[in-house]
Amino acid sequence: MATTKMAQPMRGLMGLVATAIRRGWMPGLDSMIAKPHDERWQTTIPAPFFKKTNPAIVTEDHLVEARDGFRVPVRVYKRPGTPEGAPGYFFIHGGGFIDGGVAHCDHVCRELADRSGFVVVGVSYRLAPQHPFPTGLEDCQDVLTWMAKERPGGLDPERLAVGGESAGGNFTSALALWSRDTNGPRIAHHAPIYPLTDFTGSKIDWSANLSGNPGVTPELWDTVGAMYLPDRDFTKPMASVLFADHADLPPALVVTCGHDILRDEGIALAESYAAAGVETKHQHFADMPHGYLLMTRLTKRTYETMDLMIAEAKKRF
């Protein structure tokens, strides 16, 4: 696939990030891995470059009891005056399964709640390597179950959608599989955003697309994969969701971007969904880098994507 030039100002920023990581001025994924789990849980996106928050949104913090007794931190977001029975949207952050928490995507959750009128829920799932597969995914399963049972923010449990970016996009697809296979909470719509779908790396062209993933190398990819999947079974379908049976999944929006090593496996997921009969919309932003959804100061594509997520979900409610 031909690569369109990355849009500014992201192109300049990605170049600066790559230089900073290379010279040790800024931590890359490899140095993040060395930090304590709870420090990585608190990772935020640097506000001067990426983040514009929406302070008008009402938030509530909760601890959701997971199946093993751990209390999973979640945050509920809604507009003031949101009526009882609004749809619920579970948004799951990325971070390579080893970084981030609610704070990582707080600005995105606020914006989604404001633009949609939905009750939005964010989560701090447990991270690898201390908590490898399937712990983080099970945390998300338990939070979705809690949403359906406890109706935080007064949400309607019959109108639930799920979306997430990068690792969160992987969990989004895996939640749809789990809901189908276990008769779990009904998911009306799901939106994997530039998702990781294939831990084997078989679809990655390491000679291209790296400008949108500064600091990521084949060696680092393998290291992170082994942290999340210590048994190195990289084809298990609840982790490498591309290899799952996709029949009878809920309608989906799959978003991919041109400057991303995950581009081709995201496209492959959209194609597999469609081939399995899943009602699928695939949106490809050829000029965007991986992680652009978080860059709310830098590109209107973030808002375009959020509005698309909302519009596609509303069609199913």
Regions found by a protein language model. Give the residues of each.
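A glycine/proline-hinged amphipathic helix-loop "lid/cap" segment
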Residues: 1-76, 317
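Short beta-strand element of the alpha/beta-hydrolase
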Residues: 85-95
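Short amphipathic alpha-helix adjacent to the substrate-entry channel of hydrolases
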Residues: 103-122
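Alpha/beta-hydrolase active-site loop
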Residues: 131-151, 309
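Gly/Ser-rich "nucleophile elbow"/oxyanion-hole loop immediately N-terminal to the catalytic nucleophile
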Residues: 148-162, 182
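Hydrolase active-site cap/lid region
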Residues: 177-232
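Short beta-strand/loop motif that positions the catalytic acidic residue
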Residues: 254-256
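Catalytic active-site module of serine/aspartate enzymes centered on a nucleophile-bearing elbow/loop
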Residues: 297-317
